[in-house]
Every structure is written in structure tokens, then in C-alpha cells.
């Protein structure tokens, strides 16, 4: 139901399990035309918004061809959109980047996935800004923001925890958390964020 071109990113941020692409007739409004055809897809639990965008782009290309063919054959009946069901997404910007580890792990994980490839979720380790490119959900618990494992790098959240998989120190290239830890001091019990 979300409208506008950033809905794939918003779907990941919200933890939606499904999204899709829609072919619609153009009209004077923005995304208000009649619906011609819809294709839905599941969102992978670790899929980033960038990966989802790439998949939806391919699906959209196929949908255009299918829609034009079906229109030519008279197989499509346009469906009016119910504006009362429409939701509008908010702007995505760098103010969303800081990770709040007091949130449940699924919210932290969705933020990391949803802000990849831009603007990328961030945290601080030993007072230095770190971009977090990917994560995995974990079952372990601890005090929010506390490192509960360094092999792999797991940080406790408000509920459960996340493994930080790929990170990028300020001014450096993206690397695995393991590579980062080989050159930086971080111990179980340290607090990040």
C-alpha cells in the first residue's frame, strides 16, 4: 500500500515480509492512476533495500512487458485505487543512521538492512564512527549496546541481539567485523553506540 519510489526501502525498514511492483495508468496525480497489474514478492529476512531494489527492477521490466501484452489482448480491467488505504512514506535521510541498540534486535536489523546501500546505519566504537553494512539476528541476550561476543561480533539489543557482519570505519573501506577486530581493541562487556 505504500506509495512513491522509496517504498522498497521503507518496506525493509518496517520489517515487511512482502512487497511488489505495480503497473498503473498515468494520470494527473502522483501514483494515483488505475492499477493494471500487480506482482508480489517476499522480502528475505537478511535482504537489504539495495538487493530488493535490484530484484524489483527486474520484476518491473518483466511486468511492463506482461502488462503491455495483456492490454493488447484486452485481458486487463483497470482497478481504481482506494486512496483511503494509501500510506505515504517519510523521507529517508542521514538523520535515520544512528543505531539505537535499546530497540529490539529485529528493529536494529531492519534499520541496517533498510539503510543499505544509502545512507548506511552507523554506530560508534571506542568513540569512532562506524558504518554498519550488514547484520544477522541472534538469540543471545544482554544489556543493550554491550558486546556479548567478539567471535563473531554480537551486540545486545533491547530484546535479543544482532551480529554485526560488515562494518566500515570512518575513512576506511568496508570490511568484515572479524577483519576489523584483528586491528582494533574490543572486548566482551564493552559498550558501543
Task: Write out the residue ranges for each language-model feature.
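Donor/substrate-binding cores of folate-linked one-carbon enzymes
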Residues: 1-88, 95
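Sequence-level motif detector for i,i+2 pairs with an aromatic at +2
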Residues: 18, 32-33, 94-96, 127, ...
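Short, flexible, solvent-exposed loop/turn segments with mixed acidic/basic and small polar residues
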Residues: 87-90, 154-156
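An anion-binding loop in the catalytic cleft
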Residues: 101-193
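Acyl-group handling in specialized metabolite and lipid biosynthesis
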Residues: 90-103
